[in-house]
Amino acid sequence: MTKFKNKILMGASVGRYSDAGFTLIELLVVIGIIAILAGVVIVAINPARQFAQARDTQRWSNVNSILNAIGQNMVDNHGNFTCGAGALPTTTMELGSGANNYNIEPCIVPTYISVMPMDPSTGTSTATGYSVVYDPTTRRTTVGATGEVTNPISVTR
């Protein structure tokens, strides 16, 4: 039995340390690779462009909403747009309550649309960021906006 005990004790490594684990260099290399991959992914995704595209999508939706409200007003009034601000402008005018703007809000809100849409970046109640023009020859109305990625944004009906 003594021989067995001696063999066990001799096999024990007193004073030696284990080789398990990672060295500092290995950890730094892995962190460097992760940083490079993260940089490539961020550049590929381009968050600024993604946000700009999201705002342009909102502009497309708002332009369609305004044009639908104008169309519904015209349907209810036998093909004529009825508004206290007067007939639809035949030259391009910005929508809003400002001095040189066409104030369409009282004519379509809340009957045809719940709230007057405003540009997601710069729109205010005095200058919504959306414009309107009516062509009496073709009887078509165009509502538009300035986009960030897609420029211009406009819908004609």
Which residue stretches match the model-derived regions?
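N-terminal single-pass transmembrane signal-anchor helix
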Residues: 17-45
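Short, contiguous, well-ordered secondary-structure segments
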Residues: 35, 66-67
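Aliphatic-rich helix starts adjacent to a transmembrane/signal segment
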Residues: 44-63
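N-terminal compositionally biased, intrinsically disordered segments and leader/signal-like regions
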Residues: 3, 24, 91-93
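Short, low-complexity, Pro/Ser/Thr/Gly-rich segments in the mature regions of secreted, periplasmic
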Residues: 144-157
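Extracellular/periplasmic head regions of type IV pilus-like filament subunits
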Residues: 68-142, 156
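N-terminal leader/signal peptides at the extreme start of proteins
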Residues: 1-22
